[in-house]
Amino acid sequence: MEEFKRYLELDRSQQHDFVYPLIFQEYIYALAHDHGLTRSIFLENIGYDNKFSLLIVKHLITQMYQQNHFLFSANDSNQNLFFGHNTNLYSQMILEGFVAVVEIPFSLFSLEGKEIVKSQNLRSIHSIFPFLEDKFSHLNYVLDILIPHSIHLEISVQTLRYWVKDASSLYLLRFFLHMYWNWNSLITPKKSSFDFSKRNQRLFLFLYNFHICEYESIFVFLRKQSSHLRSISSGTFLERRYFYGKIEHFLEVFTKDFQVILWLFKDPFIHYVRYQGKYILASKGTSLLMNKWKSYLVNFWQCYFYMWSQPGRIHINQLSKHSPDFLGYLSSVRLNPSMVRSQMLENSFLIGNAIKKFDTIVPIIPMIGSLSKAKFCNVLGHPISKPVWADLSDSDIIDRFGRIYRNLSHYHSGSSKKTSLYRIKYIXXXXXXXTLARKHKITVRAFLKRLGSELLEEFFTGEEQVFSLTFPSSTSQGLYRRRIWYLDIVCINDLASHE
């Protein structure tokens, strides 16, 4: 327990009490808007000297506090002028400058070499594919979990105040979130809320990433602790300020709901992977152990983050019977039976042996759905032309379609069966031919007859050429059986995400 207390006790160097004054510095807005540091953003066309920028920002913030945002709508964009300028425009600038300011404390940790997340096991996408290759076949169950979102934006502010000890900055953040909350209400147009979220993606991305960072720092720390993690130890999930008082409350809730204290034994084979607002816990344990982890996680979210993570958002799947959709792949572990004849003296007998084999398959139906949304084919997978590209040159059109196929083929190079990529290649090649035919106002057949199919083939064979250069002795048939993970993949392909 003392170790938990030392971990949850914040370092004084992490408390930043003077973040708010940075909002009044002009260079913050220059950094936030990528303007030169010598340009004045607020004083351009106003006529004041640079020394008055602090006064202008202060007046703008004061006026923003005095607005009635319940009566605010998207049609007010030309009203509420200040110094002859749109106050809403300047409030947007202040918000972006504020986001740049609150990111500073966390950037300092990177510059100083400090780690907010105390774990050596959080890695990039580069380690996920070898994890699938080496570890997945030895596991039995997987928990497929949707990361819950805050039911109220105030929870994000409460979590952030552990790191930014600045009441003024947090109050300003509450104001912006309150403005968003009102724009998202029923009495205002939905377009206003959408526009606010779209213009301030950096703010919400920061809050979401901080939310995930705080969650992982505690979850992974607790995961690595005692050999027997009893449910009574879950008091460490609770708010740092009310550590001891909340333990009793948690035990009452837990005892009331479950009547018995469950034990969660340390599972040395558990693996944690987060991606696309989800995460998985893959384990070699039994179904009972996975159900205990499920209860553990539900209480973790509810008691520490005050989020009701419904058990229905956590799915327990047995890998031998279920193929989870993971990073654009259908991953499965199947038994590959084999018979071995053994002979001892004059007696011979057959020995049955089942070897686990890990398979990654390209999900063709979701892939076609993604291509259909991008207007490369219809819902049935029939290629269609791309009218918006018809004004480009022939080489640019072919190169764009070819790049789409090469990127998808490159991303799914780790698939054990690549026959589905032939379908993707057909869609991209036929859609390129249809677009070119549309541009030249002739039929696809006439276009291919005039130029020949070789023109398209040279743009759609880049991936096979890479394979042949890497493995000169490989045959064409062997290329589509070989599983290769490329380390230059830095993110999930948009068309492969199926989101």
From Swiss-Prot:
<keyword id="KW-0819">tRNA processing</keyword>
<dbReference type="GO" id="GO:0003723">
    <property type="term" value="F:RNA binding"/>
</dbReference>
<dbReference type="GO" id="GO:0008033">
    <property type="term" value="P:tRNA processing"/>
</dbReference>
<keyword id="KW-0934">Plastid</keyword>
<dbReference type="InterPro" id="IPR002866">
    <property type="entry name" value="Maturase_MatK"/>
</dbReference>
<keyword id="KW-0507">mRNA processing</keyword>
<keyword id="KW-0150">Chloroplast</keyword>
<dbReference type="InterPro" id="IPR024937">
    <property type="entry name" value="Domain_X"/>
</dbReference>
<dbReference type="GO" id="GO:0008380">
    <property type="term" value="P:RNA splicing"/>
</dbReference>
<dbReference type="GO" id="GO:0006397">
    <property type="term" value="P:mRNA processing"/>
</dbReference>
<comment type="similarity">
    <text>Belongs to the intron maturase 2 family. MatK subfamily.</text>
</comment>
<comment type="function">
    <text>Usually encoded in the trnK tRNA gene intron. Probably assists in splicing its own and other chloroplast group II introns.</text>
</comment>
<dbReference type="Pfam" id="PF01824">
    <property type="entry name" value="MatK_N"/>
</dbReference>
<dbReference type="Pfam" id="PF01348">
    <property type="entry name" value="Intron_maturas2"/>
</dbReference>
<dbReference type="GO" id="GO:0009507">
    <property type="term" value="C:chloroplast"/>
</dbReference>
<keyword id="KW-0694">RNA-binding</keyword>
<protein>
    <recommendedName>
        <fullName>Maturase K</fullName>
    </recommendedName>
</protein>
<dbReference type="InterPro" id="IPR024942">
    <property type="entry name" value="Maturase_MatK_N"/>
</dbReference>
